A protein has these predicted regions:
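Juxtamembrane "helix-exit" motif on the non-cytosolic side of transmembrane helices
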Residues: 158-171
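Perimembrane loop-to-helix junctions flanking transmembrane segments
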Residues: 35-58
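Loop-to-transmembrane alpha-helix initiation sites
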Residues: 109-119, 174-180
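Helical transmembrane-bundle signal
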Residues: 13-27, 73-83, 97, 101-104, ...
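Membrane-interfacial, low-structure loops and terminal tails that flank and connect transmembrane helices
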Residues: 127-145, 206
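Alpha-helical transmembrane segments of polytopic membrane proteins
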Residues: 66-70, 173-186
């Protein structure tokens, strides 16, 4: 088993599920109201998307009711968390995690969290795939960043809300900063985890 890959897949799925819980909560607060379009802001009034760095947590939903959307999103978010942490390493576990994340994307679970979950699901399909690469200098270097790259990624996902509350105007003026940091840390986490698995496979074969 690719242990680092399993941890990354589970972590990404956890992030997607947690994002679903958060978005669903704010959608429920908007009550039994109909969205104006398929694209919604999870956070209702007094939040104004044009005045806050997180755009009031944008999402999309195919369900024409905020209350129903929020309830279903929270339920699916909880299921996603449980599946990611307990079952992603099992047969078809990665594919199911990706499917749950697609569901979150379609019913109000946000935009970025479900995409992270889908990536986690795709990684999950490789957990039990035999390793073919042999360690090289590049993979050994990347392996040294495990698990700290993943820790940094997870810390930033939560820290961005604190940073946003303190430097709202700065983040609004530099809107690409947060997605670039998230994407960069996510890619480094995946590569570091793969490097670690390559090294562990070599030790197991020795």
């Amino acid at each position: 088993m690719r242990e680092a890959t399993r941890i990354i897949a589970a972590s990404f799925g956890f992030v997607a599920g947690l994002g679903g819980l958060e978005h669903g909560y704010f959608e429920i607060l908007q009550g039994n109201a109909r969205p104006d379009s398929i694209m919604i802001a999870s956070m209702g009034a007094p939040c104004v998307p044009e005045e806050i760095w997180n755009l009031c947590e944008p999402a999309m939903t195919i369900i024409p009711n905020f209350l129903v959307t929020g309830i279903l999103t929270m339920v699916l978010g909880l299921v996603t968390i449980v599946w990611a942490l307990a079952f992603v390493h099992r047969g078809h576990g990665g594919a199911i995690l990706a499917s749950l994340s697609v569901g979150l994307l379609l019913i109000g679970g946000g935009l970025f969290p479900p995409v992270i979950g889908i990536i986690g699901g795709l990684l999950g399909t490789k957990i039990n795939t035999p390793m073919r690469k042999r360690p090289s200098a590049v993979w050994r270097m990347l392996a040294k960043m495990w698990p700290w790259a993943l820790v940094a990624f997870l810390i930033w996902l939560f820290a961005q809300f604190l940073v946003g509350s303190l430097f709202n105007q700065f983040l609004m003026e530099n809107a690409a900063l947060i997605p670039l940091l998230v994407l960069g840390l996510m890619v480094v986490s995946i590569l570091a985890g793969y490097g670690h698995d390559v090294q562990q496979n070599e030790r197991a074969d020795a």
